[in-house]
A protein has these predicted regions:
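A conserved structural/catalytic subdomain of Rossmann-like adenosyl-cofactor enzymes
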Residues: 5-181
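Phosphate/diphosphate-binding loops
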Residues: 2
Length: 181
């Protein structure tokens, strides 16, 4: 295998060429970290939040028509700082954010952080987002992890973007263009 050990964020994303782009990106980037100013300068949307820098990198790395699934803190959807607003705007304008899976706290062992999984395709603006709030009916944790049964309803419903008690459609036309939430 071709394994390169480096800090992806240290690369200026303007240097990414068409030949570097990928069809699929699946990621659970670190969040809560803070990057130094010299790293932030590699990105058009300057922020110290590691996960937001990775999200910019993923968008840039995708080919047109490329797909991404990325885990990120749920606060990304509502934070009002400049970087969060600008990144949501970029995501909604450059990609079709077709699905948001809202996971329960504790879905990832060792952290109680609430997360969402963003599923998007690069190359066309978002019109509608199917939002699914996963309710497993129990506390999650190391001895009670997320399992296939917990995910079964989501997997079935996402095939048709079914509307249920746990899922709904958000029309991007109703999104506040000042905050992009």
């Amino acid at each position: 295998p071709n394994i390169i050990h480096s800090n992806t964020l240290a690369e200026n994303i303007t240097d990414i060429q068409e030949s570097d782009r990928k069809d699929v990106v699946l990621a659970n980037p670190p969040f809560g970290g803070k990057e130094q100013t010299q790293i932030q300068q590699n990105f058009p949307i300057s922020t110290g939040e590691t996960a937001y820098l990775f999200l910019q990198h993923f968008i840039k790395m995708l080919k047109v028509g490329g797909r991404c699934g990325v885990v990120i803190k749920n606060t990304f959807l509502s934070n009002t700082d400049n970087a969060s607003v600008a990144l949501r705007k970029q995501l909604l304008e450059e990609c079709s954010l077709h699905t948001i899976l809202d996971l329960p706290g504790g879905a990832f062992t060792g952290t109680g952080v609430k997360t969402v999984v963003l599923f998007f395709e690069k190359g066309r603006a978002t019109e509608k987002v199917w939002y699914y709030q996963l309710d497993v009916g129990r506390n999650m944790g190391k001895t009670n992890p997320l399992n296939d049964k917990d995910m079964a309803d989501f997997i079935e419903c996402q095939k048709t973007s079914a509307l249920t008690d746990n899922s709904w459609i958000v029309d991007v036309g109703t999104v506040n263009k000042d905050t992009w939430d």
